[in-house]
Curated annotation (Swiss-Prot):
Belongs to the class-I aminoacyl-tRNA synthetase family. It is found in: Cytoplasm; Cytoplasm, Cytosol. This is Probable arginine--tRNA ligase, cytoplasmic. Its main location: cytoplasm. Forms part of a macromolecular complex that catalyzes the attachment of specific amino acids to cognate tRNAs during protein synthesis.
Length: 589
């Protein structure tokens, strides 16, 4: 309503279409100075305005017609500022939330567009550890956001389920495997087997190296040279059998894969994550043959001591990329090429996002460059969503921490904190479930507090606090709003007299609620969860300030009903934001 009025008047003054001017209107942070502002230079992208921006701002301010909506116009540098009817603004915001409820702030901008989000993607032979947490929750946040904005969204888990390490795993399982332990916890057991066999293989390699050094130095070797195939040789041969379609080798590999996926799904359920497709490197073997031939036909392959490489040194200085080993087996990037083509042909997409750590930046630059050289025009529709590392996640001995252990530990710690308030604890229907949700909220919000591309320090004590900017604090704010509704003695009245919300705290809370659509757009444009998290903390703080003075209990009915609507709207928006972040908003805690 207010932005539309501003756009309408500016359209007359500039002869720029009102809907284009709407894109340039910003909500201000300093409400004492203005409620909305238009940076005049931004208008130049639609039409070259004659005159200096600061002079134009002064000129436009003098010509704005004041009315029920616009109550003041002024210029500050290149900005044209507007003061609006705040009482009317509060009413309009709350009426929109009443009408749209959880859909407030959401648009249908994604209608008719299909996106694939590939995320989480653990390696079956390696632990599902804390490092996978960021990819999993960032990808889940993106899927939730895209769904809210009407995109057709495909969530994909591209399992690392192919490569020489599976040969190594098969060799290791034959030697160290336990059926009982495999069925009890396939992920942990396969990891332990992998560590054991890999350690043994490394000792063999060290012995070979030592033998060669002793011979070169002309001394008697301390141990004879191993003449039987090494563990790595056996693993390579096993993987070659897999690539050649050997039924026995594939049956063992498939069993490891299937059991691992069942366990992964348990963990994903706790994380509130669901995948439409469980894909994997193994599923693109046929496509690899076709794409490899295309690389040959386009003369992109070069021989390098029996292996095949692609030269990407010009123009982007991306070096030479190995795409086939001397024994004819493929590499990760070869499978990524085939996977991208397969998805475009068989699923289709307008955009595809890879949510993978920033250590893989160079890999994705190489992948996208190769696809471009193969003349795949849709290569421009691929985006690598990178992120920094989580520090402080290893044990004191430097060993890896499993993600499930982190979730169990946060749940246990949260349960202990909850038990400190016996009265509230007794009111909770399923305390273990609630502790799990609050624990997950602590982990997720600590992660999302940091900018996506930054490293951050994992801090158990800080993240579990119910005060300060933490996950438990946001859940507490939501639960408190639910409690206020239950205990107020009033019902939600959509026709409440909202003109009674005249206090500064009511204005501040309503205006914060009204910023949600803008925040959603900013979050979508940046694909940055910290933007949404920062806003939710602002909203929770505004609610807390309002609680101090805007009471409902024992107030006059009309005033109480208006305040009830204000708090109800805050609850709707807070809940909406938490759900986009992948969290279940709690009603009691």
């Amino acid at each position: 309503m207010f932005q539309e009025e501003i756009a309408k008047q500016l359209s007359v003054l500039t002869e720029i279409e009102a809907n284009k001017i709407l894109e340039c209107i910003e909500s201000t942070k300093n409400k004492d100075m203005a409620d909305f502002a238009v940076p005049i230079p931004k208008l130049n992208k639609f039409k070259k305005l004659v005159g200096k921006p600061d002079q134009l701002a002064i000129d436009f301010a003098s010509k704005i017609q004041l009315n029920d909506c616009i109550q003041g116009a002024s210029a500050t540098g290149n900005y044209l500022n507007f003061k609006v009817n705040r009482l009317l603004q509060v009413q309009e915001i709350l009426k929109e939330v009443i009408n749209q409820k959880e859909k407030y702030g959401m648009t249908e901008q994604g209608k008719g567009k299909k996106v694939i989000v590939e995320f989480s993607s653990p390696n079956i032979a390696k632990p599902f550890h804390a490092g996978h947490l960021r990819s999993t929750i960032i990808g889940n946040f993106m899927v939730n956001l895209f769904n809210e904005l009407a995109y057709e969204t495909v969530s994909m888990n591209y399992l690392g389920d192919w490569g020489k390490q599976y040969g190594l795993l098969a060799v290791g399982f034959e030697k160290y495997g336990s059926e009982e332990e495999l069925l009890a916890d396939p992920i942990k057991h396969l990891y332990n087997v992998y560590v054991q066999i890999n350690g043994e293989a490394e000792k063999e390699e060290e012995a070979k190296k030592k033998y060669a050094e002793e011979i070169a130095a002309g001394v008697e070797p301390t141990a004879p040279l191993q003449t039987t195939p090494t563990i790595h040789d056996t693993a390579r041969a096993y993987f070659k059998r897999m690539e050649d379609g050997d039924a026995e080798a594939l049956a063992i590999w498939k069993r490891f894969r299937d059991l691992s996926i069942v366990k992964y799904k348990d963990i994903y359920n706790r994380l509130n994550v669901k995948f439409d497709i469980y894909a994997g490197e193994s599923l693109v073997t046929e496509g690899m043959t076709i794409e490899f031939k295309k690389l040959q036909d386009k003369n992109l392959l070069e021989d390098s001591q029996g292996a095949k490489v692609i030269d990407l040194s010009k123009p982007n200085k991306l070096g030479k990329v190995l795409v086939q080993k001397t024994d004819g087996t493929t590499l990760y990037i070869t499978r990524d090429i085939a996977a991208a083509v397969d998805r475009k042909n068989n699923i289709g997409f307008d955009k595809m996002y890879y949510v993978v750590a920033s250590q893989q930046d160079f890999h994705f630059r190489q992948l996208f460059d190769i696809l471009g050289k193969m003349d795949y025009q849709w290569q421009k529709d691929l985006t690598h969503i990178n992120y920094g590392m989580v520090k402080g996640m290893s044990t004191r001995k430097g060993t890896v921490v499993f993600l499930e252990d982190i979730l169990n530990k946060t749940q246990k710690k949260m349960l202990k904190i909850m038990k400190q308030n016996e009265q509230k604890f007794a009111e909770i229907e399923d305390p273990e479930k609630v502790a799990d949700i609050v624990g997950l909220s602590a982990v997720v919000i600590q992660d999302f507090n940091a900018k996506r591309n930054k490293d951050y320090d994992f801090n158990w004590d800080r993240m579990l606090k119910s005060d300060g900017d933490t996950g438990p604090y946001l859940q507490y704010a939501h639960a408190r709003l639910c409690s206020l509704e239950r205990k107020s003695g009033f019902e939600f009245n959509p026709n409440a007299n909202l003109s009674l919300l005249s206090e500064p705290e009511a204005f501040n809370l309503a205006i914060t609620i009204g910023r949600y659509p803008e925040i959603i757009q900013l979050t979508h444009n940046q694909l940055e969860p910290s933007t949404l998290v920062g806003y939710l903390f602002e909203l929770a703080h505004a609610v807390s300030s309002a609680h101090q003075v805007l009471w409902i209990k024992d107030r006059e009915k009309d005033v109480a009903e208006a305040r009830f609507v204000l708090y109800w709207a805050a609850k709707v928006i807070l809940g909406s934001g938490l759900r986009i972040l992948g969290l279940v908003p709690l009603e009691r805690m």
